[in-house]
Amino acid sequence: MNHKDPLVSWNVFGLDVVFNLSSIMMLIITAVIVFVIAIICTRNLKKRPTGKQNFIEWVFDFVRGIIESNMAWSKGGQFHFLAVTLIFFIFVSNMLGLPFQLISGHTLWWKSPTADATVTLTLSTLIILLTHFYGVRMKGTKGYFQNYTKPIFLLPINIFEEFTSTLTLGLRLYGNIFAGELLLGLLAGLVTGDSTRAWGWIIGLPGLVVWQGFSIFIGTIQAYIFVMLSMVYMSHKVQDSH
């Protein structure tokens, strides 16, 4: 389990900027998979949907329900495609590391990109920044920042809340996916390790199968939670009351 990430460091204006090549590769693969799913499911659309069109319409309806549970559709409708893209992207990201891990030497190349805290915190930061952008856009600068100063003594708490929202949104996703893959690796080690003792197979193989199924469930739930909380934070910024 002593695997390392393929890191590359570049010096930019005197600062060392580190990139994880594995995470970058997996993010690109995730984006390609989501794009292919979208193309396949939206080709040759019909008035009476069947098969893949039924699936994509169900996803859109499901995500619409998430949005409408947090804000009026007149305001939340513009975030429909954002939320659908998020739920697909995070779900696929969560699933990629479950079937197997690709290791060259001691370098881990294939894993779920959401098992990297940098990736999940970047996603959560982008979501929080988007909530501020749309808050200012829909309320105006003055109306938006009044939410932070009414009453004035809550200003420090409101500012602190922005940081905690970013951290909890990103770290919740990272913690669940990373822990799941870590345990999968341990169970796989019992089955494929150097030891040929029967107990390794007896414990490891059933545990691996059960935990694979549980990890699929957790990955699905985490995609839902991330999108739900994103829309909750968005509604706080664009609704008339904070």
Swiss-Prot record:
Membrane topology note: Multi-pass membrane protein
Localisation per UniProt entry: Cell membrane
HAMAP family according to UniProt: ATP_synth_a_bact (MF_01393)
Chief place where the protein resides: membrane
Entry's Gene Ontology molecular function annotations: proton-transporting ATP synthase activity, rotational mechanism
InterPro entries, alphabetized: ATP_syn_F0_a_bact/chloroplast, ATP_synth_F0_asu, ATP_synth_F0_asu_AS, F0_ATP_A_sf
Annotated function: Key component of the proton channel; it plays a direct role in the translocation of protons across the membrane.
GO cellular component terms, semicolon-separated: plasma membrane; proton-transporting ATP synthase complex
Pfam families per record: ATP-synt_A
Family: Belongs to the ATPase A chain family.
Protein keywords: ATP synthesis, Cell membrane, CF(0), Hydrogen ion transport, Ion transport, Membrane, Transmembrane, Transmembrane helix, Transport
GO terms, biological process: proton motive force-driven plasma membrane ATP synthesis
Organism encoding this protein: Staphylococcus saprophyticus subsp. saprophyticus (strain ATCC 15305 / DSM 20229 / NCIMB 8711 / NCTC 7292 / S-41)
PROSITE patterns registered for this protein in UniProt: ATPASE_A (PS00449)
Quaternary structure annotation from Swiss-Prot or TrEMBL: F-type ATPases have 2 components, CF(1) - the catalytic core - and CF(0) - the membrane proton channel. CF(1) has five subunits: alpha(3), beta(3), gamma(1), delta(1), epsilon(1). CF(0) has three main subunits: a(1), b(2) and c(9-12). The alpha and beta chains form an alternating ring which encloses part of the gamma chain. CF(1) is attached to CF(0) by a central stalk formed by the gamma and epsilon chains, while a peripheral stalk is formed by the delta and b chains.
Transmembrane intervals: 21-41, 79-99, 116-136, 173-193, 198-218
Lineage: superkingdom: Bacteria
Protein name according to UniProt: ATP synthase subunit a
Key word GTP-binding present: no
